[in-house]
């Protein structure tokens, strides 16, 4: 699974995910599902904000990277991906500048056009179930919630989807591509079935121990433990390099 993540996501996103897991004392080689989920969530947050700017009239506009007007103010401030200290510093700065109510939990983005914090969710379950879980945790009408699924569904506070349809379609397409790539590698079933993932992981680890003496076989195949994706963890720069990660994952 770790190999898949490193092939599928941009190195900058992978590095941010590694730092996040290290900050919370988590081992990405053991919690490979969380590693994949964090990378997915980070990429959705970047895609959410990408190309969106605010012009001099305060209107939201979409600008392609080659456009000379790229120096316009970014519509979204990305909070996700920063270490906790820096993230809270950014949140406090936004609150002091805009007068926004300080959230109890760290949000993912701030929308300068709508003047609100945004919580992004990516789920492999029913979107309405995950939305309710998020809303129950946050307990604030000030933070806007937007949930995406790997099946193309989405749900947002008061059905206000913030972005235009084309921008949201890009995110949905990327999530669907990730799902297809996982499925092609036999990872998707264990990704959506926690019990099966744990059962298969134990089986493969036991198999590894029995085959430890066979170095030739070990070198010729991928470690079974790396093929298992455990249950998904639910939950700066905007560069051309980051945008390259939105392309389809390479096949092995």
Curated annotation (Swiss-Prot):
Record site feature (Important for efficient shutoff activity and nuclear localization), residues: 195, 198-199
Keywords: Decay of host mRNAs by virus, Eukaryotic host gene expression shutoff by virus, Host cytoplasm, Host gene expression shutoff by virus, Host mRNA suppression by virus, Host nucleus, Host-virus interaction
Sites annotated Important for efficient shutoff activity: 202-203, 206
S-S pairs: none
Active site: 80, 108
Subcellular localization(s) per the UniProt record: Host cytoplasm; Host nucleus
One Pfam family hit: Flu_PA
Primary site of residence: host cell
InterPro entries in alphabetical order: PA/PA-X, PA/PA-X_sf
Molecular function, one GO term: RNA binding
Domain notes: The probable endonuclease active site in the N-terminus and the basic amino acid cluster in the C-terminus are important for the shutoff activity. The C-terminus acts as a nuclear localization signal. The C-terminus is recruited to host protein complexes involved in nuclear Pol II RNA processing.
Protein family: Belongs to the influenza viruses PA-X family.
Annotated function: Plays a major role in the shutoff of the host protein expression by cleaving mRNAs probably via an endonuclease activity. This host shutoff allows the virus to escape from the host antiviral response. Hijacks host RNA splicing machinery to selectively target host RNAs containing introns for destruction. This may explain the preferential degradation of RNAs that have undergone co- or post-transcriptional processing.
Protein name: Protein PA-X
Organism: Influenza A virus (strain A/China:Nanchang/11/1996 H1N1)
């Amino acid at each position: 699974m770790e190999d898949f993540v490193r092939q599928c996501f941009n190195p900058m996103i992978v590095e941010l995910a590694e730092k996040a897991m290290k900050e919370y004392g988590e081992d990405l080689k053991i919690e490979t599902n969380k590693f994949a989920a964090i990378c997915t969530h980070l990429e959705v947050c970047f895609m959410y904000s990408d190309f969106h700017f605010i012009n001099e009239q305060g209107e939201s506009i979409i600008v392609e990277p080659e456009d000379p007007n790229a120096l316009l103010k970014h519509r979204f401030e990305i909070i996700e991906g920063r270490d906790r200290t820096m993230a809270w510093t950014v949140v406090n700065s936004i609150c002091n500048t805009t007068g926004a109510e300080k959230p109890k939990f760290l949000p993912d983005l701030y929308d300068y056009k709508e003047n609100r914090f945004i919580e992004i969710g990516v789920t492999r379950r029913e979107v309405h179930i995950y939305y309710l879980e998020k809303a129950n945790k946050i307990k604030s009408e000030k933070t806007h919630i937007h949930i995406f699924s790997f099946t193309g569904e989405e749900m947002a506070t008061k059905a206000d989807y913030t972005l235009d349809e084309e921008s949201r379609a890009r995110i949905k397409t990327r999530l669907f591509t990730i799902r297809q790539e996982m499925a092609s590698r036999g990872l998707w079933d264990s990704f959506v079935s926690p019990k099966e993932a744990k059962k298969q992981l134990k089986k493969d680890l036991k198999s590894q121990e029995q085959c430890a003496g066979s170095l030739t076989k070990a070198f010729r195949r991928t470690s079974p433990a790396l093929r298992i994706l455990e249950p998904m963890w639910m939950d700066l720069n905007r560069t051309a390099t980051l945008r390259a990660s939105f392309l389809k994952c390479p096949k092995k």
